Amino acid sequence: MRRGRRASVVLDVASGDQNPADPNLETFNALFQSGTYSGRAQLLGPSNSIRFEPTVTFAPARQLLASAGFGFYWRQSVFDALYGIPGQVVVPSNGVTDRYEGCRPNVQIDWQLTRHLSAHVNCIYAFNGRFEERSVGATRTMSYVSPWVTYRF
């Protein structure tokens, strides 16, 4: 890994259903989707979503890579729900027309231990937006840490 810094911005848009009453399902369906669609510590799937996430990545040491980002999330269609990674409804629309789903600051550290072995940790904190508050009364924030080790042949 090279030492240095990098700034990046991600903008993802995945369609949502514009009219739940018609027979056309317009919600984006990522067939065989990965749980890491928009990060290794992901709460929601890529259906009916808009994500804007600036991130800074730097290498404080030769085998160490750290990144910090702040993701902002909106619903692409106010007539559609929020979906989990396999595509199931997590937060139904319930007639709520707010788009703002929330924001999630996150930090990730990757450490290359040997040529084949690496260790990783990702920390995320989720703030609920107006949509969750009005749709299901979710006013509490959520945080979690996901550590893992990778061995590559």
Model-derived features: positions:
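Transmembrane beta-barrel strands of outer-membrane/channel proteins
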Residues: 9-13, 68-72, 121-125
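Membrane-embedded beta-strand positions in outer-membrane beta-barrel channels/transporters
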Residues: 42, 53-55, 94, 104-108, ...
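Residues that define the transmembrane beta-barrel architecture of outer-membrane proteins
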Residues: 3, 48-52, 99-105, 139-145
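Residue-level signature of outer-membrane beta-barrel architecture
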Residues: 1, 11-13, 58, 111, ...
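Repeated loop/turn-to-beta-strand initiation elements of outer-membrane beta-barrel proteins
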Residues: 4-7, 63-66, 111, 115-121
